[in-house]
């Protein structure tokens, strides 16, 4: 099974490569702190932007790298502590870029600086930062919120994953076998397993664990949300506005979507009832809501077979895809193993400074699990295509990234449906 190998990136937190990258980042942020306050003409602004690009790329890459380390084993605290330190540096970076962009936003279009300065590589990030909800906050308030994020939000997020990692669920299969599952395996089972007994016993075990630790979970979620709500209050901003900004979607678009959903609730309910009847029940059990369609026989798709199918579909889109996806696996950029303490779910993490697309998931061999891989490889391919762009142009809104992944999964569905030997 494909597994992450960090030797091609920073190795470990104690490696010379990682220490060198951190030293370079700290030196750049120090230089930047002296440049930004005095950047008032095209030459000094250009120099400041050059250092901003370096800091942007390195902070994003190192934070992403530590996220990957933490996800492999959420019980390991070294990477979690390092993420806190890096977020403190990132908060300083954001204060500096906000200060500079505030100055640029105040310039008239006729100002000679715009004619003298090559700003083309920064227009995208400038538009994103200047429309962010926190852009209107005072420097002092902004600094306070970022300090709170570094000291509260990041540790709480790691605490949440650590709490999940302590779960060892005892579950049963439809064959009567008893097995033990980690939290990540439990989540994967509910989303992808064809075994109804396994889904039911997994849900029961998860529910018991959540009930036993309800106070801890509630406390963590309250801490995660609390300081953000206070920040939105400072900015006189509706709490949904940051989500709209992050996904580059308007409130009007979301309202239109929800109106369409409400108008078609009867169809959604009918689909759930129909699915329940297909399983031989009159109502849909909660542990079956994300389950794949029941089959006459349980199937297991080896990872190699799943990847071959994904590459075959991808080749229709671009002939380079098969060899590129093989490269991702060979380089150790894909992680799909079932491990104790592993973070649940799946995510894609691009390491900008190294052009490394990192795929994280837990593969169980089901069709739904293969579909999840297609989504992740879609994200990775999208990242790979942009590797020649400046780092500051590659942080696209989350909604656009999701489109790239789900488009790839749709290609997989259509291909399998077209070549299926039967309706099943």
Which residue ranges define each predicted feature?
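Post-HExxH zinc-binding segment in Zn-dependent metallohydrolases
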Residues: 396-424
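Active-site hotspot residues in diverse enzymes, especially metal/ion-binding acidic/histidine motifs
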Residues: 242, 278, 287-288, 305-312, ...
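Hydrophobic (often cysteine-bearing) scaffold residues that line and stabilize catalytic clefts
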Residues: 202, 206, 213, 257, ...
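A well-structured
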Residues: 1-296
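A short secondary-structure junction motif
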Residues: 224-227, 231, 271, 275, ...
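Active-site-adjacent "gating/activation" loops or surface patches in catalytic cores
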Residues: 175-191, 299-383
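Post-HEXXH active-site segment of zinc metalloproteases
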Residues: 371-372, 383-407
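Inter-helical turn/loop segments and adjacent helix faces that build the functional surface
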Residues: 251, 317-320, 384-392, 414-424
């Amino acid at each position: 099974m494909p597994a992450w190998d960090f030797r091609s990136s920073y190795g470990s937190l104690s490696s010379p490569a990682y220490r060198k990258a951190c030293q370079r980042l700290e030196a750049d942020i120090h230089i930047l702190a002296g440049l930004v306050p005095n950047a008032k003409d095209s030459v000094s602004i250009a120099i400041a932007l050059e250092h901003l690009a370096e800091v942007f790329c390195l902070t994003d890459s190192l934070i992403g790298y530590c996220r990957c380390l933490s996800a492999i084993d959420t019980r390991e605290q070294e990477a979690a502590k390092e993420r806190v330190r890096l977020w403190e540096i990132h908060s300083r970076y954001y204060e500096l870029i906000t200060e500079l962009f505030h100055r640029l936003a105040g310039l008239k279009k006729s100002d000679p600086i715009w004619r003298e300065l090559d700003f083309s590589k920064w227009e995208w990030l400038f538009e994103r930062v200047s429309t962010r909800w926190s852009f209107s906050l005072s420097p002092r308030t902004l600094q306070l919120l970022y300090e709170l994020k570094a000291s509260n939000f990041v540790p709480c997020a790691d605490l949440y994953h650590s709490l999940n990692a302590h779960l060892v669920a005892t579950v049963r299969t439809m064959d009567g076998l008893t097995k033990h599952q980690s939290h990540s395996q439990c989540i994967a089972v509910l989303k992808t397993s064809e075994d109804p007994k396994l889904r039911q016993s997994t849900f029961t075990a998860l529910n018991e664990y959540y009930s036993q630790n309800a106070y801890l979970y509630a406390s963590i979620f309250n801490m995660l949300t609390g300081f953000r709500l206070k920040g939105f209050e400072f900015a006189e901003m509706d709490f949904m506005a940051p989500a709209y900004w992050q996904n580059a979607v308007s409130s009007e678009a979301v309202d239109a979507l929800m109106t369409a959903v409400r108008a078609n609730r009867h169809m959604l309910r009918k689909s759930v009832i129909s699915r329940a009847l297909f399983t031989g029940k009159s109502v849909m059990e909660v542990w079956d809501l994300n389950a794949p369609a029941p089959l006459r026989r349980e199937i297991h798709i080896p990872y190699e077979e799943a990847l071959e199918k994904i590459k075959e579909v991808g080749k229709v889109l671009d002939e380079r895809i098969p060899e590129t996806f093989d490269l991702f696996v060979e380089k150790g950029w894909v992680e799909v193993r079932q491990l104790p303490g592993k973070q649940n779910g799946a995510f894609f993490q691009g390491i900008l400074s190294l052009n490394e697309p990192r795929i994280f998931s837990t593969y169980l061999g089901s069709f739904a699990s293969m579909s999840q891989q297609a989504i992740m490889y879609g994200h990775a391919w999208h990242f790979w295509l942009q590797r020649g762009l400046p780092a500051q142009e590659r942080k696209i809104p989350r909604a656009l990234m999701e489109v790239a992944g789900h488009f790839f999964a749709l290609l997989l569905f259509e291909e399998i449906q077209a070549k299926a030997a039967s309706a099943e």
